[in-house]
């Protein structure tokens, strides 16, 4: 791998990959935020804020054979902007302040999406189980991967570089496995909103679907950028 460290830092292809990932990720974030801002100005007909939507769904929606109070142990408010998430470890559902407090179409969709994750866990979703298995490795894999990749370049050690690529591949697998999890959660969210009568108009349905689609695109962007980066590392290894 002679002189490969110089190739890594000054290779035009590396700059192209970096710019592409920034554009893709930035574009996805811009789209989700603009979509959220649009539908966060539209009140939902049920006049329910995000926390109330989550509570209604917990009481009325289906979670396999598990009661809603077991599928979602607690609904809490957390700081941050669009920091909403469902934690499968303790089955807690966290909503950001804006989502929890506003009775809008956007808040309704975001809250329902997180409840959708609770339904996935209760029903034993295979994709969610696969993603959960990858979480520990995906949390530390990329950081360790960069150390091996940079070390392999500096030391001209093909073995180290290869290990780094394999470790980074775990993060790529996690990103790819996340896609069906998020898409399925969104599908469940729309179905639950309709089945429980929270959605009462085509406008609300279209708005919720727009929100959920925009959210899904952020995960598509993450997967695409991870794949592009992995392909660059593989290309670099082959020509070094």
Give the role of each language-model region:
Residues 142, 148-149, 165-166:
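Glycine- and Gly-Pro-enriched alpha-helical subdomains that act as flexible
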Residues 2-38, 152, 158-165, 171, ...:
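Hydrophobic alpha-helical transmembrane segments of small proteolipidic membrane proteins, enriched
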Residues 2-5, 26-141, 173-231, 235-240:
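Polar-ligand-bearing catalytic/cofactor-coordination segments
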Residues 147-151, 230:
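Alpha-helical transmembrane segments of multipass membrane proteins
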Residues 150-153, 199:
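Conserved helix-loop functional segments at active or binding sites
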């Amino acid at each position: 791998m002679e002189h490969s460290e110089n190739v890594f830092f000054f290779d035009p292809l590396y700059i192209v990959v970096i710019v592409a990932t920034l554009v893709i990720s930035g574009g996805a974030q811009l789209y989700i935020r603009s979509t959220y801002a649009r539908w966060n100005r539209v009140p939902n007909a049920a006049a329910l804020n995000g926390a109330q939507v989550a509570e209604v769904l917990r009481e009325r929606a289906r979670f396999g054979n598990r009661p809603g109070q077991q599928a979602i142990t607690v609904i809490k408010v957390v700081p941050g902007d669009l920091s909403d998430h469902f934690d499968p470890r303790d089955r807690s559902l966290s909503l950001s302040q804006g989502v929890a407090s506003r009775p809008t179409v956007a808040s309704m969709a975001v809250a329902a999406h997180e409840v959708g994750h609770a339904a996935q866990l209760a029903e034993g979703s295979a994709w969610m189980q696969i993603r959960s298995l990858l979480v520990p490795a995906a949390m530390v894999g990329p950081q360790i991967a960069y150390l091996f990749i940079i070390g392999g370049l500096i030391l001209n050690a093909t073995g180290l570089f290869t290990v780094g690529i394999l470790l980074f591949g775990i993060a790529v697998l996690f990103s790819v496995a996340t896609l069906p999890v998020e898409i399925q959660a969104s599908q469940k969210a729309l179905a639950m909103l309709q089945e429980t009568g929270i959605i009462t108009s085509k406008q609300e349905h279209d708005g919720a679907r727009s929100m959920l689609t925009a959210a899904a695109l952020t995960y598509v962007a993450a997967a695409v950028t991870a794949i592009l980066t992995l392909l660059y590392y593989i290309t670099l290894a082959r020509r070094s």
